[in-house]
Every structure is written in structure tokens, then in C-alpha cells.
Amino acid sequence: GFPKGVMLTHHNITNNGYCIGQCMKFTENDRVCLPVPLFHCFGIVLGIMAIITNGGCAVMLERFDPLVVLASVHKERCTALYGVPTMFIAELNHPMFSMFDLSSLRTGIMAGSLCPEWLMREVMDKMYMKEITSVYGLTETSPGMTQSKVDDPVEVRASTVGSDLPGVEVRVIDPETLEECPVGVQ
């Protein structure tokens, strides 16, 4: 489609990045591997802003290549990794996957589309990302609106959009009546 102009303030993107990083418990000891593009909010806000506002380090890759990602995590001892589900599938299925030590990983973000529970479990088990989260958002919301918690059960991380981030108000509207739904309605 056509590009859209979206007005984002410095406060919006800084605060959103900070809250994303806090949700993943980033500290100055964290190193995030970013194989996602920086021209998109996923890379620049959820990635760069999240890690620098929480004092950590970004390991930036020129483009996505599963072998380069695995080698970078291994060499740089990254503690976090970002991607969309298909990127994680490509990494897990790479023929050289078992040659890399990924035990430094603990968290990250899987976003961009629905994450099947089986994939979330494989990433947690085979890539050691026990605290991986999912984020839902829009460019217009700077971009994160909701995020799962690092200690949410895997079923919650894979089947929901998580909880609203600080400063975000969420309402669920009945599409037929356009009325706000009471808490607990499904």
C-alpha cells in the first residue's frame, strides 16, 4: 500500500520503548540482537529505544539471515532476540542450528503475526528464551499497546495480546452494538 504519515512525539517513542524494556526486565547487562529493520517501529522503538532507555546494548544486523542471527547471538552473548514467527522458524530449522550456543538468551519479542503455541514452546526450549514476550501495536500507537509478561504462562503469551502497557487505555467494543463490553465478556 501507500506510505502513511504518522505523527509520533519524542515522548511517545521514548516512553513506549522504556515500558517495553521494563516489561522484559532489561538492565545494563542485556544485549539485544536486532535482525528486524530499523526503518520500522519494531526495530527502532521496540528495539533500539527499549534497550538504550534501559541501559543495555544493541547488536544490529544489516539484514535478516538466520545463520548470521545465530552466529551473532553466539558470538555477542545476546540475552534477547527479536523477530516475527517466520524468522524464528527459519532460525530453528537452520541446518547449523545445533552448532551455536544460545544459552545466553533469556527474553525477546515475537510480534508481527499470531505466534502458534508450538512455536513459542520451541523457542522457549531450544533457544532458551524462557521469558520471551509478544507485543501488539500499531505504528500510530508508538507502536506498542499491549505486551505479555515474562512470567505469563506460555498459553497466555501465545494466545493473547497481553496486558496494556503503562499509559495505554484499552476498551473492548461489541461490534454489533458499539457499546463497551463489561469485564469478562467473551
Regions found by a protein language model. Give the residues of each.
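Conserved AMP-binding A3 loop
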Residues: 1-15
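Conserved beta-loop-beta connector loops within the AMP-binding
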Residues: 171-186
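Conserved G/P- and acidic residue-centered "switch" motifs that form tight phosphate/ATP-binding loops
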Residues: 1, 55, 112, 137, ...
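Alpha-helix capping/helix-boundary segments
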Residues: 65, 86-88, 115
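Conserved AMP-binding/adenylation subdomain of ANL enzymes
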Residues: 14-31, 39-80, 94
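Gly/Ser/Thr-rich phosphate-binding loop
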Residues: 70, 75-83, 92-156, 169
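Short beta-strand->loop structural element characteristic of the AMP-binding/adenylate-forming
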Residues: 5-7, 34, 56-63, 133
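Short Gly/Pro-enriched turn/cap motifs at secondary-structure boundaries
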Residues: 158-164, 180
